[in-house]
Every structure is written in C-alpha cells, then in structure tokens.
C-alpha cells in the first residue's frame, strides 16, 4: 500500500493535528482496535491506534524513557520483577531490560496483532526485547490478568491507550483498578502510568494524579513536550516520589542500575520534567475529582 494521505488526529472535539503520511506498512481492524503502521513525512515510522498517534521514530525515546526511568530509579532497591501493561511496540520493555537487576519483565497486552506488527515493522522500538530470556509476553486483557495473577512485582508500568469512552483501557485509570495494583506490589514498590496531555486534557491529567494519590498516598507528576503529539504529555507515579530525587542521586543511580545508553533522560531532564509550571500546579488545587468505576474519567476527544 503506497501513496500518501492525511491523518487528522482529533485532540479535542474542536481541534486536530494533521499528519502527512507517505506510506502505509500495515493496517488491520482487530477485535479490539484499529491498528495502522505508517511512515509520516515529518516523524518517520509511526504507530496509530483508533486514529491516535501512539509513538513515532522521531521522539518515542522521550516518552518511553520518561515513563520508565523515574519510577525504576526511585525504588529503594533495584527492581527484579517488573510488570508492564500495554506497551505493544516493545519500547517500554526495551527500557526496563536496561536494568542490570531485572530478572523478569512480564508484558501484558490485549492485542496480539499489535505485537505481531511491532515484531515485523518496529525493530527500532523493541530492539530485540521480545526475544530477551527475561521477557514473559502474555496476550490477555490487563484487568483480567491483574484479577488472576498470584505474583507480586517491584514495579508496575502502565503504557496504555488513553481513557477514551468505550475503549479497551478506560477502566484501567480508576481508583478500584489502582487498588488492585497496590495489592500485587512488593513492599517499597511503585507504579507509573501515562497520564494523557496537560495541553489538551488537563482535567484528566490532574484527575489521574488525584486518583493515584488517593490509593497510594505518595504520588508525583511529570510532563514533557512531545512534538509528534503536538503538545505536552504527562506521567503520574504512585508509591514512590521520583520528584524528590536530587540530580546527584539520579546520576549515581543511572550509573549503578542501568546498562545501556539513554538518549533523553538524565539528571537535568529529570529535574525539568518534574518542575511543573505555575499554571498547571494551580489546577492541582482546583480539581478534586477522583476517577472511579461508577464515574470514570475520559479524554475529551
């Protein structure tokens, strides 16, 4: 399938980000979602799910490094067992496996087709992580897995699609779900979730923070600019406080715990990412909503 067309990615009901597509590598409507792998004119190779850009070759490393490393470096002990929900491209798994201490990384994704596409087309993302002997890949619903697992983990990473109404993942942003995660964490463990965009869904970003803080008591929020997402992108951490790590602590723990190169994350980017601007911090005082199964939060688009 060659040629070109435009992807109009709706970020709110009244604005979109237009992406020129040079080539479509693969496209399929699975039982769970519409998956497309393309070559963007500006951002290179990219994954689209249900009309939303999930990651691109241009800046996926920024997203995945900030998702993974503040959590794993802030754990009191180097992690041994890590659980990933989502993250079908394999890049979150790639970053987790950089930790010398990791003995087992369990990755759970609902859609086998995304994994199949990633293995075939997205080597730059996973870089062989699916074949690592420490990797355990499970194809099932994340909520079902959490309800049934008997194992406990040092860290849980939620690399999920946005909480869109009637999607496969919106119930994975609720208080009840986070309580289940707390129950399968080892002592001293923590979680992180992608938390949508402070640019386009600030109320959702803050509500995810409120919900995690309600369950874990300890919580912190970070953000970064993602050009391929056309705005700021947020992350929320629970059970640990990566925002309290000093620059020296970040540097020393990178040296001690990580084997492999980081392209974005370091002591300086850590500090900047947790330095929320005044206008965003003020919303944390105004918005008090907590997402529950009876009243879940959704992104506006």
Curated annotation (Swiss-Prot):
Keyword field: Cytoplasm, Polyamine biosynthesis, Spermidine biosynthesis, Transferase
Residue ranges annotated for the PABS domain, each copy included: 4-240
Annotated binding of S-methyl-5'-thioadenosine, by residue: 33, 109, 141-142
Recorded GO MF terms: spermidine synthase activity; thermospermine synthase activity
Organismal lineage: Archaea, Thermoproteota, Thermoprotei, Sulfolobales, Sulfolobaceae
EC assignment: 2.5.1.16
Role summary: Catalyzes the irreversible transfer of a propylamine group from the amino donor S-adenosylmethioninamine (decarboxy-AdoMet) to putrescine (1,4-diaminobutane) to yield spermidine.
GO annotation, cellular component aspect: cytoplasm
Example GO BP: spermidine biosynthetic process
Pathway: Amine and polyamine biosynthesis; spermidine biosynthesis; spermidine from putrescine: step 1/1
Protein name stated in the entry: Polyamine aminopropyltransferase
Binding positions (spermidine): 64, 89
PANTHER family, A to Z: THERMOSPERMINE SYNTHASE ACAULIS5
Subcellular location: Cytoplasm
Family: Belongs to the spermidine/spermine synthase family.
The protein's assembly and partners: Homodimer or homotetramer.
Reactions catalysed, as given in the entry: S-adenosyl 3-(methylsulfanyl)propylamine + putrescine = S-methyl-5'-thioadenosine + spermidine + H(+)
Active-site annotation: 159 (proton acceptor)
Entries under InterPro entries matching the protein: PABS (IPR030374), PABS_CS (IPR030373), SAM-dependent_MTases_sf (IPR029063), Spermi_synthase (IPR001045), Spermidine_synt_N (IPR035246), Spermidine_synt_N_sf (IPR037163)
Name of encoding gene: speE
Enzyme kind, highest EC tier: transferase
Highest taxon above the source species: Archaea
